[in-house]
Amino acid sequence: MARVLRLPDKGRLLVCTDLQGCMRDFNRMVEVFEQALIQYHGDAYLLFTGDLIHGPHIEPEDWPDFLGEYYRDQSGELMIAYAGLAAQYPGRVHGLLGNHEHGHIGGPHTAKFAADEVALLEHILGPAGTARMRGIIHTMALAAVSKCGAIFTHGAPAAIISSVADLEAADLSGAGFASPLDILDTPVIGKILWARSATEAEARRFLRAAGGTISIYGHDVIPEGFEKVGDEQIVVSTSFGLFDQNKVYVSMDLAAKYRTVHDLRVGQELLPLYPDKAPARLGGRARAITQV
């Protein structure tokens, strides 16, 4: 059975997508969150939308540009840091399940940076570390809902559901998979964890069933930082696959009402992770290089 996170009806919510083992960006997001706690008098929340783990193990000289800013995978350390942060701020730091986390608790094993990323990370962590990581993953929700209208998932809102109860009834065990490919056709979790896109009709149907108006998710890499799809969907890239200047996180007022994704404005709700590097189009402060 899966869990659905129900966010409070007031406070500031910060949203971070797809770190994939990038400790530097995790630490920067923690810094932003702790600044928000001060700014909003302790009433702030931080949500990670899955895929905190499974990054590259590549030397700098072999690093391809399409992976964005260089880093080395620190998945094990990041998960421990995430759990520590959640313990430090009870009820204010949350994580959603991504397809990469799911591989460690019954889902198909991913193979982006290794033939079997699940086996590799568990080998690195050892039995005790693996058990601890799995315990952390089991605390993660499949989706988050809010009264401000935003519904949060790892992947696109393409799943067919009739209510939030269908999300809560989803089987995460993987017991029915004959092969890893079966996940793609598995009701609810197949789409929520793996879908990179949803049609306008699919998104509207999902949001109506979940009681929301807009869908915010990651999973796919948006090199420009974010992409609005119609009135209902926005894909956000906070870390993985991007250069620092294009990394974006979301900052929302949980007491507000967001009717369309166009209510999310650059410089207000859509903010650069590294403002000193980001261009003006993302609300950044980077200085243009003058040609002499």
Model features per residue range: what roles?
Residues A111-A210, F243, R287, Q291:
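Active-site-proximal loop/helix segment associated with metal-binding centers of metalloenzymes
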Residues E269-V292:
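A short C-terminal boundary segment appended to hydrolase-like catalytic domains
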Residues M1-D73:
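N-terminal active-site segment of His-dependent metallophosphoesterases
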Residues V15-T17, L46-D51, H94-N99, F152-T153, ...:
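Active-site neighborhood of phospho(di)ester-bond hydrolases with catalytic His/Asp-centered motifs
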Residues A111, D116-H123, S197-Y258:
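Conserved beta-sheet core of the metallophosphoesterase superfamily
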Residues G42-A44, L52-I151, A158:
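Active-site neighborhood of divalent metal-dependent phosphoester bond hydrolases
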Residues L5-L14, V145-I151, D231:
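Beta-strand-turn-beta hairpins that frame and shape the catalytic cleft
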Residues C22-R24, H54-H57, H100-G106, V145, ...:
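Active-site environment of divalent metal-dependent phosphoester hydrolases
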